[in-house]
Amino acid sequence: MESRGRSANSPKADAKATTEARAPPAVDGKVPSAKKQEAQKAEKQEPPAAPTLPPAKKTSALLDNHSNLKPAPAAPSSPDAAPEPKGPGDGAEEAEAPSGGPGGRGPCPFENLNPLLVAGGIAMAAAALILGVVFLARKK
């Protein structure tokens, strides 16, 4: 797809890299050591050490930020303190529905629909496959 540039994974790019890594023989005819070149490259490629930040104090509130656990309810200040009465708009209606459905009519009809949808999808795919095979067989 790329007509102009070559990707880094192409074998020609690797061949160029290996030829560049090889140094020409020195004037006296000896090939310089590859280990020296690798050591020099390693020194050049080493990133500067990142400054370390002093560790922040960890509090329990910060550690529990991403936890799924709910905090324990706080104990009332006095033993005879009654919980606040539930008023309109604070979710009292939803908490009192014993049947689990809206308005006490029973469970939601769409609650367990996922397995039915999967089974229906498999049945439709099988029917399409059978009809496709029959159609192609009649054409010949």
Curated annotation (Swiss-Prot):
Chain segments carrying region Disordered: 1-111
Chain intervals with Low complexity compositional bias: 71-81
Residue ranges, compositional bias (Polar residues): 1-10
Cytoplasmic compartment residues: 1-115
Spans within the Extracellular topological domain: 137-140
Cross-referenced InterPro entries: Cend1
Biased composition (Basic and acidic residues): 35-46
Ranges that cross the membrane: 116-136
Sites of Phosphoserine modification: 10, 78
Disulfide topology: none
Location in or out of the cell: Cell membrane; Endomembrane system
GO BP, one annotated term: cerebellar Purkinje cell differentiation
Tissue specificity as recorded in UniProt: Found in the spinal cord, cerebellum and cerebrum, where it is localized in neurons.
Top-level division of the source organism's lineage: Eukaryota
GO cellular component, as recorded: endomembrane system; mitochondrion; plasma membrane; vesicle
Similarity annotation: Belongs to the CEND1 family.
Oligomeric form and interacting partners: Homodimer. Interacts with AHI1.
Function: Involved in neuronal differentiation.
Name of the protein in its database record: Cell cycle exit and neuronal differentiation protein 1
Primary gene name: CEND1
